Amino acid sequence: MTLFLSFCVLTLSSLLSSIHCNVLVPRGLEACGGSLYVEDAVVIDVPTQENCIWKVQTDKDHILVFSLADGGNFERIYDFTTIHDGLDGDAPALLLENQIHHEVGLTRAGILNSVYTTSSEAAVRFKNAPTSTFKLRIQKAVNCPFNVGSESQCGRIVDDTSCYCATFTKRSQASQSSFCIANQMKLLAIESLVEELAVHSTWPTTYFWTSGTDIATEGIWVWESTGVNLYPGYANWGNSEPDTLDGEDCILIHSTVGWQDYGCGSGQDGVCEAR
């Protein structure tokens, strides 16, 4: 029997298991269901027994997302598995057709291949033994609204668990930051090329405010929404930028121009994010 040792704490109570885990639940120890707390992500083998039930929870301010670990068609599990939107077995079943379909990103109509709960709890009932072996991935995710008001668009543009909302109402950098906070999000802090490309491929040819600023100390750039210094992290300044002109203390981004230091009071679109 193979044991997976990464960051999992396993306790057995009667015939059920209670597991806090970030990766793989070992097949031989799972008994037939139990309680599972998802700290980040977990992959479980579908049991070979019938009527096994996992009660799954995560942090109260997050939700859960279920997908197949191999990326296969999620609908193939329905013959063997029912995922309930809550711990009660009478809670509604989660189906692809009753999910929010965003206008952009991985959860837009036609490509959605995972299901999301509406709270931090779910019950997974393996009602029949599967005819083939497959693994179910369960991740902790943030809630992602359809939009954050008029002239806005939201979606899971980077991965299954985070959320980005573009607002096309022009505001100052400080006002865009306040708008994001009012919607339980933060103004964009770009941590990688992958993240920046996702933003620009989703909303091209648009200038966006970020939370980057050197307003506290000239030349010391900080992602205000996270408190993390820009350097030595990822940066993508445009030609001759930052040019350190007086009053240009906030980072404005564009898909073809790169990053610019710009006057924080200028009215620009913005991107909010939640992770």
Language model regions located:
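Carbohydrate-recognition loop of C-type lectin domains
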Residues: 245, 250-271
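Domain-level representation of secreted and single-pass membrane ectodomains enriched
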Residues: 3-8, 12-150, 178-183, 201, ...
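Well-ordered beta-strand positions enriched in small/hydrophobic/aromatic, beta-favoring residues
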Residues: 81, 163-165, 210, 250-251
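Conserved hydrophobic ligand-interaction patch in extracellular adhesion modules
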Residues: 167-212
